[in-house]
Curated annotation (Swiss-Prot):
NCBIfam families: rpsG_bact. The gene is rpsG. This is Small ribosomal subunit protein uS7. InterPro entries: Ribosomal_uS7, Ribosomal_uS7_bac/org-type, Ribosomal_uS7_CS, Ribosomal_uS7_dom, Ribosomal_uS7_dom_sf. PANTHER family: RIBOSOMAL PROTEIN S7. It comes from Petrotoga mobilis (strain DSM 10674 / SJ95). One of its GO terms (biological process) is translation.
Amino acid sequence: MRRRTAEKRNIVPDPIYGDILLSKFINRLMYDGKKSLAQQIVYSALERLAEATKENPIEAFHKAIDNVKPVVEVRSRRVGGSTYQVPFEVPENRATSLAIRWIVTSAQSKKGRDMVSKLSQELIDAYNNTGPSVKKKEDVHRMAEANRAFAHFRW
């Protein structure tokens, strides 16, 4: 049997911009507890994003995240001995965390020297609705669209 659901932890906003989403992004990028290094990388990438977009860095960052957020995704559902990929709507908090994860992993998988340039390029691509993280979102949407016939298994 399931126990009670875990309580949501309140996340401290980041020190410079006072933004909770940016704090989540920094925490996702952090390796081995090196938060100050992750903050330096993210803040430098945001400066480059602001230069490229000629916009407030936080607004540009939020727009980049919104462009990567998925609306629907598929989940495996076993019905009568066969497994179907059933499309489900994605809750807001899961959509945000998926978008952050996709941006960070696609920036990490880029070939290049420093993480600042890779991350800033990925954020610029996400802002302009291009790049691997947006492609990942479109692939997820395409899978959900292809399996729309199984949407009635969504009980």
